[in-house]
Amino acid sequence: MRLILLSGLLLLGTFLANGHDTDPEGQMLNSVIESVMILQKEFANLKHAFLTVHKARSFGSGSERLYVSNKEIGKFEALKEICDQAGGHIPSPQFENQNKAFANVLERHNKEAYLVVDDPANFTNWAAGQPNEADGTCVKADTHGSWHSASCDDNLLVVCEFYFIL
């Protein structure tokens, strides 16, 4: 059985290698191969264009993560839903450059926004006297990027974090 299967594969390979431009199957096969090659080239071009824009945006912000606001104001639960629907996340800066990029958005809008602090965090930027759970169980960043405990019911600027893994 294996011998028959191997023979069939060998014959198919020989048939495909010969091209057979004149018969309809050969023409169709050549057309499919040509289409795949065109699609591969288009994909490579799109990937290059995407990476160029992403690198330019990252260069401008100093962070691989992008922080974007839709200028809406909302409570923590609304923010989670909005960011999820947009394909992003609630901001969670892991490094100083990410926190700076996040703070730039807040400074530009002159508003505070929620963020999530991982436990244990590699990076924190708590303001003096913070965290203070008496102020609330959520965390917000001020326009300078300093972190404060906050109520989850505060209406703050909606900012979502986006990052790309390639």
From Swiss-Prot:
- Database matches in Pfam families: Lectin_C (PF00059)
Disulfide-linked positions: C83-C160, C138-C152
**Tissues expressing the protein:** Expressed by the liver.
Query: Which keywords has UniProt assigned to this entry?
Result: Calcium, Disulfide bond, Glycoprotein, Lectin, Phospholipase A2 inhibitor, Secreted, Signal
Q: Name one GO molecular function term.
A: carbohydrate binding
> Where is the C-type lectin domain positioned along the sequence?
46-161
User: Which compartments is it annotated to reside in?
Assistant: Secreted
- Under the cellular component aspect of Gene Ontology, which terms does the record hold? extracellular region
Which residues does the record list as glycosylated?
Answer: N122
Check the record and name the PROSITE patterns matching this protein: C_TYPE_LECTIN_1, C_TYPE_LECTIN_2
Give the InterPro entries listed for this entry: C-type_lectin-like (IPR001304), C-type_lectin-like/link_sf (IPR016186), C-type_lectin_CS (IPR018378), CTDL_fold (IPR016187)
Q: Where is the signal peptide?
A: 1-19
What is known about its subunit structure? Homotrimer; non-covalently linked.
Protein family according to the UniProt entry: Belongs to the alpha-type phospholipase A2 inhibitor family.
Q: What does this protein do?
A: This phospholipase A2 inhibitor binds directly phospholipase A2 in the presence or absence of calcium.
What's this protein's name?
Phospholipase A2 inhibitor clone 09
Instruction: State the organism of origin.
Output: Lachesis muta muta (Bushmaster)
